[in-house]
Design a protein with these regions (language model features):
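N-terminal post-signal-peptidase region of extra-cytosolic proteins
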Residues: 46-53, 97-104, 167-176, 424-427
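Primarily a LysM-type cell-wall glycan-binding module
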Residues: 18-42, 69-95, 132-165
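N-terminal, post-signal-peptide region of Sec/Tat-exported proteins
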Residues: 39-76, 111-112, 176, 181
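Residue-level recognition of short, solvent-exposed, well-ordered loop/turn junctions
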Residues: 29, 59-63, 80, 109-115, ...
């Protein structure tokens, strides 16, 4: 198939008192709910509703809501006009490093009035630590300017001319201790007392922080924690083994450039906390620069917390139903949370299909997308968009729900190949395209049968959303598949997504990024240049103290005439 690709706290804080911010503002992001927001800030949904008269559970992206301070968690503070990193650190009796370490997403660019940050409770910086703070006032050394001595000038007259003391002038020019002032001498004029100290700008402070963190590693140490199934081979184990194999291929490519990389593989067993803690207790774990895994939800928080405390990049490779990134600054969630993806799809679908007639068809097959479809309908209702829901059993009557002269978009409730084929076969029998503009909107699973149903996908100009897409016709994908078969004597397991490619994308992006940026990887994640085989990445912090979520969502559109359009959003 010819393919066209378009990548479109009153709180007492270490002895410092300050005006309390009892409530702070939160701007709702796509996919967030009152519950997820309450969990993020350590308060209850009712606590939030008490601060927002009339607030319902139906919140929208972009909406601003008031959130009360948690009595036990970190203090949330909104930067005020005119404040600097140093002035805030003085207010809370801590160093600027305490603040920037707690808010790794903070930068000179977003340090401005209205920005929300966290201040760790119970942290105190000594007077000596605050004096050594990179944001603290610094003494200017050297000469402010030079002066050519004229006839009849004296040390006294020159010191008065430049508002410096005679002692300071002599100190800056030791020759004056032993020699008299002479015409033609060039003197160093020191800074006056009122100009002797200066406070570094926020730009200077953040630049220095970045410089200190950006030290490259002589050797990169990586831990991979996956359920390899060493005791018992399962479908999950086979997929995770493919992921590991793809990861190793990426690492080998990076090693070819001269990088020194050590891989430590650990078997993820069971679902109890003790099994994962046994891995984390290994002395070498604290030396890791990257931890890939685990994949089981019961283990993710423990590893994320360990990585958070030890400043280790932690990749959550598969789960969409965890919230580790909310409170763990070094966590990266490869698969966007389902709420985010769903909400994004609803909004983008309506934006792209304004005015279309939408028909939901309830198929006989069981749906794995019941929550998604329920949310889809609720979203359309909230936007006053009418739609039709009908049973597949009455499909012969679908024409009465379709409209001529406008686009009709059919959304089946099931994502299987059988459901798709059943539906389009009925459409063919009814010759619907003779009288109506008709298209189907589906699911990521449609990739599993796209090769066998290419003609029908093209005929009905089908579209589906996904966060991953592998194009077998791309030379890079073909080359990867050859390397995989050549190195491991077997092809990737047929699955959706393909776990070998997922592993390669994770390895190339994270190990490659850490190799290039060292300890500054998280501050430079947006500068990592990598074109994915299957899983495109755009990692964004939810806030200044959180970890990262991958925000990429794609729409795959069959345009007819053997053309495919890929619309990438992030």
């Amino acid at each position: 198939m010819k393919k066209l690709f378009i990548v479109i706290a009153m709180a007492l804080f270490s002895g410092a008192t300050f005006a309390q911010q009892n409530v702070f503002a939160h701007k709702v992001r796509v996919g967030e709910t009152l519950y997820s927001i309450s969990q993020m800030y350590g308060v209850t949904v009712n606590d939030i509703k008490k601060e927002n008269a009339g607030l319902t559970d139906n919140i929208m992206a972009g909406q601003s809501i008031n959130v009360p301070q948690s009595p036990t968690g970190e203090l949330h503070y909104t930067i005020q006009a005119g404040e600097t990193l140093y002035s805030i650190s003085k207010k809370f009796g801590v160093t600027s490093k305490v603040i920037t370490d707690a808010n790794p997403g903070l930068s000179a660019t977003n340090f401005k009035s209205g920005t929300l940050i966290v201040i760790p409770r119970g942290v105190y910086s000594t007077a000596d630590q605050r004096k050594q703070d990179i944001a603290a006032p610094k003494e200017r050394t050297g000469c402010k300017l030079t002066h050519l001595v004229a006839k009849k000038e004296t040390v006294y007259s020159i010191s008065k001319l430049y508002n410096v003391t005679q002692a300071d002038l002599i100190k800056a020019n030791p020759v004056l201790k032993d020699s008299k002032l002479k015409k033609g001498m060039t003197l160093c004029i020191p800074y006056p007392q009122d100009e002797r100290y200066y406070t570094p700008s926020d730009n200077e402070v953040f630049s220095e922080i970045a410089r200190q963190k950006g030290v490259k590693y002589d050797r990169i140490k990586v831990a991979v924690i996956l359920p390899f199934g060493l005791d018992r081979r399962t479908s999950e184990a086979n997929k995770m083994t493919d992921l590991y194999k793809g990861f190793l291929l990426a690492v080998d490519s990076i090693k070819d450039s001269g990088a020194n990389i050590d891989i430590y593989a650990y078997e993820e067993k069971g679902s109890d906390a003790a099994s994962i803690q046994g891995i984390l207790d290994n002395p070498e774990m604290k030396e890791m620069n990257l931890i890939v895994g685990p994949v089981r939800p019961e283990h993710i928080d423990a590893v994320a917390q360990f990585a958070h405390v030890n400043n280790i990049v932690n990749v959550i490779p598969t789960s969409t139903k965890v919230n580790a990134v909310n409170s763990h600054k070094t966590s990266f969630q490869v698969n966007s949370p389902q709420n985010y993806t769903n909400s994004f799809v609803y909004e983008k679908f309506l934006e792209l299909n304004s005015g279309a007639n939408v028909v939901f068809v309830n198929m006989s097959d069981k749906s794995d997308y019941a929550d998604y479809l329920w949310g889809f309908k609720k979203y359309l209702e909230s936007k006053n968009v009418s739609f039709v829901s009908m049973q597949f059993a009455a499909i012969e009557n679908i024409a009465k729900h379709l409209k001529k002269g406008t686009r009709n978009i059919i959304i089946p409730s099931a994502s299987s190949a059988a459901a798709f084929e059943q539906l389009v076969n009925e459409f063919n029998t009814l010759n619907l395209l003779d009288n109506f503009q008709l298209s189907l909107f589906g699911y990521p699973d449609w990739q599993t049968f796209s090769d066998n149903n290419e003609k029908m996908l093209d005929k009905y100009k089908c579209s589906y959303y996904t966060t991953f897409f592998s194009d077998e016709a791309k030379q890079r994908v073909a080359n990867f598949n050859y390397r995989f078969r050549h190195n491991f004597k077997k092809a990737q397991i047929a699955s959706c997504p393909k776990f070998g490619e997922l592993g390669y994308d994770i390895g190339a992006f994270f190990v490659g990024g850490i190799n290039n940026f060292g300890g500054g990887f998280m501050q430079n994640v947006d500068k990592v240049k990598y074109t994915s085989l299957q899983n495109p990445f755009n990692f964004v912090r939810k806030n200044n103290w959180s970890g990262f979520e991958n925000t990429v969502v794609m729409f795959i559109n069959y345009k007819g005439n053997d053309m495919i359009e890929i619309q990438r959003y992030e």
